[in-house]
């Protein structure tokens, strides 16, 4: 696979534009012990545990890409009151979130062939950010060095869709 991808995140247009790498998260399933006199056996559980969806993205000079995620955090934490929460609700009306909860967003990852033809689409449902990397400024860096940020998201589930 070539690793060429596109990531559609309606609530984060700048992050989407500057996206450098993403992952298809790992999945695990719980297990229930079966106790027998001489052995310990297990049976599959009934809950999937999804790993985080991670995005590495370039940080532009005005920090817009980083601020998009930071503002999403502020909208559901509302450190300055309900106005920030209302701001995200207004954005939800302008963008296609795919959900009735304004602090959640759906996202679609499209894996492309070497000829830029879509091969696989992965749809993430009801996603929201849980962490964003630090911004580290260094006077020893050259003007050509571009900062890269990482954001981690959780979601309800993901599905593979036809390309």
Residue ranges of predicted features:
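Glycine-rich, low-complexity intrinsically disordered segments
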Residues: 8-163
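Short, small-residue-biased leader/transition segments that mark boundaries at the very start
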Residues: 1-9
């Amino acid at each position: 696979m070539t690793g060429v991808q596109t990531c559609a995140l309606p609530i984060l247009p700048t992050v989407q534009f500057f996206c450098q790498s993403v992952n298809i998260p790992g999945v695990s399933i719980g297990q229930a012990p079966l106790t027998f006199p001489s052995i310990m056996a297990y049976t599959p559980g009934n809950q999937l545990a999804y790993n985080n969806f991670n995005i590495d993205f370039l940080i532009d000079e005005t920090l817009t890409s980083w601020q998009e995620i930071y503002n999403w955090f502020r909208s559901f934490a509302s450190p300055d009151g309900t106005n920030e929460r209302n701001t995200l609700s207004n954005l939800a009306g302008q963008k296609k979130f795919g959900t009735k909860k304004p602090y959640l967003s759906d996202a679609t990852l499209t894996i492309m062939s070497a000829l830029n033809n879509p091969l696989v689409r992965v749809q993430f449902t009801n996603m929201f950010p849980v962490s964003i990397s630090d911004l580290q400024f260094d006077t020893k860096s050259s003007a050509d060095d571009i900062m890269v940020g990482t954001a981690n998201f959780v979601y309800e589930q993901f599905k593979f869709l036809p390309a």
